[in-house]
Amino acid sequence: WTKDFMDNMQSEINATLSSTLGVETRECSGQDKIDCSKLHSTFKLPIEYVNPEELHPLSDVVTQDLELVKEEGELSVYERLFQPTNILGHNLIDDWKKQFTSNKQYLLDTQRVISETIPPASFFDNSGTSDQEFVKNWEELKINHDTFLEKYGFIEFSMLESFNRSPLFLQLLSVANMMSPVVSLMLPFIFLIFPFIILKVRGIPISLNTYITVLMDIAKHHFIGKMLNNVKNISPTNLIYMLFGTGMFFYQIYQNIISCKRFYRNVQKLSSHLMIFKDYLGHSIESIEQFVLKHKDKTSYLEFCRESYRHKMVLIDIKRILDVHETSDFSVFDIGKIGSLLKNYYELHSNQEYERSLRYSMGFEGFLDNLRGLKLHVSKKAVYNVGINDETAC
């Protein structure tokens, strides 16, 4: 009942926010091709939502003169101001230096945002996952599509790629991949046992001669049958053939075992990745929700809150999919869950709507990290609000 109560509360909050913000759809804005050059490519700072006529770009010359950027190894003004503590916060520094605004309402609202916001602790501080590990997991998820399909044993033929979204099909395919070494090892024993079954079914008395006759007939087109046949007519050529065939047989078994172990390790890895993304999504959803609830009434932040809310709803959809995964420690006892694991990992890899919202959440996490650094300066009285009124020139 506790889970149902929390779900109902979440639904009430979402309904209230949707009504207040005037958001009627879960579709996120910007359906163009995703820019993969930076992690937070779909995220825009609140300043970028103000009237374009009141948004003024900063040239590279000005940013250099103001020391807003520095050479590698030196700290810029923005880095000293925001004190980024992780990769996501550091990556956002370049976005701050691109423009400034003369919109007084935005400046006043931003002062209130800084004073009223209590940013939650960074996901990387409490989760046991470092920012480098998180980014590495993301890069592995977003590797080249063909490489991704081959690495995790998905169907590579484009006309059949829809099967990669079928948990049942992926489960059967995965079990077949992992069983191939066992089947290869058992094949000789199957050949040796099968003649007994045939003779028994036919009601033929079992003797050594009848057994060998049936065995040779069954295995005549297989390596084992040919090897048994060559035993009768041993010669240097047949001996070489037997040794080569035996070597190839065991080499095939070895390759199957290596392939099976590699596949198992990859499944263990993606299981761990999904749990990290699941925990991150829970943190990100809560962070966005708290910010939107706190600042949705600020005029110049309304569009930013709307966009954040839209992406939050998509993040909720993603987390709902990942909630079925309960542990990152995949073992042989979890083999029955492989189909679901692979399907969900493929969905995260290929679904562009999910990618847009995940990239947006990384930008939002970086934004909160910058806000934490700025708040620290304010608390130490190293940074003060400037007075703004109707007579103040902007």
Residue ranges and their predicted role:
Residues 1-324, 346-374, 385:
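Conserved amphipathic alpha-helical "coupling/scaffold" segments
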Residues 375-394:
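Long, charged, glycine-rich C-terminal linkers/tails
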